[in-house]
């Protein structure tokens, strides 16, 4: 089971229980919630890449509708919430990236189906683990 993490926006301290306030700052603060330590580490890495100029427009928990064709046109049957989206530098161009972080243990059949369906809609999904891209 993944360990949930709340990261203080002010000082960056990690909290493993839902905090009322930050233990380091001593004040009420806002927190970023992550479903796992690995996802929080990936977010920190993406922020470093932003500072280095390698990526831009980083966003978290972006929702993509999963569509199918019904008798009266397109129907949304589910949603995929991607962990991160960003633009990655590729020479002189910027390439949009949709990324989902998964534990090394693998992904659920439900998640695999949603990723395949989004890719069928023309959106490539980069699946990352602690060991790198899958």
Predicted region positions:
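Electrostatic, structured charged patches in enzyme active sites and in nucleic-acid/phosphate-binding
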Residues: 1-134
């Amino acid at each position: 089971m993944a360990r949930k993490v709340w990261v203080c926006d002010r000082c960056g301290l990690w909290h493993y229980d839902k905090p009322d306030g930050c233990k380091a700052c001593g004040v009420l603060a806002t927190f970023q919630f992550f479903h796992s330590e690995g996802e929080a580490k990936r977010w920190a890495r993406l922020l470093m890449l932003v500072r280095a100029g390698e990526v831009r427009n980083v966003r978290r928990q972006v929702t993509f509708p999963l569509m199918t064709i019904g008798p009266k046109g397109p129907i949304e049957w589910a949603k995929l919430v991607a962990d991160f989206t960003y633009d990655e530098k590729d020479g002189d161009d910027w390439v949009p990236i949709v990324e989902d972080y998964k534990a090394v243990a693998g992904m659920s059949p439900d998640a695999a189906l949603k990723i395949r369906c989004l890719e069928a809609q023309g959106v490539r999904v980069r699946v990352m683990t602690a060991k790198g891209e899958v």
